[in-house]
Amino acid sequence: PKNIAGPKVSDEEVLKHSLKEAEKKFKKKFDVIVDLDPTSPLRNINDIKKALNKFIKTNCDNLITGSKPYKNPYFNMIEIKNKSVSIVKKSKKKYYTRQNSPKVYDMNASIYIWKRKALYSNNLITKKTAFFEMPRERSIDIDSKIDLLQVLSIIKEFKRNNIKIKI
């Protein structure tokens, strides 16, 4: 529907609509929703299984996935406000390398798992959100042409080295 189409609509709104339609169609109420983002094609079945196991074991409200970042907001990410440049995440302590900066992660938009009530809370991250770390090479989210080229290059390299991809 038009009201949930377009770049300004959250994934959560689309999921709520899909859940409502699925429950109508199957005449069932679903307690858990698993969202596998189509723009993250390199995740594999083991990533999904491990994320689900962590979701169950931690009794969290929802689970998000991510990977180690290329940049760190305490060290080498900036923002520009009123022509003034500053580090994104300010801290009293100075960090001279990315490696000794506080550990942060990139959300990779690969796997989201929600308890029904958490999906309707309208908060992606809460005190009961769990995190599952995936390797960088399977965490590419295709948002641009360069992302697509990177994914195609990885797939080509896997094929060249006869590495099986279980997607």
Where do the model's predicted regions map?
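Hydrophobic helical membrane-anchoring modules
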Residues: 132-133, 138-167
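Conserved N-terminal catalytic core of the sugar/cofactor nucleotidyltransferase
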Residues: 1-29
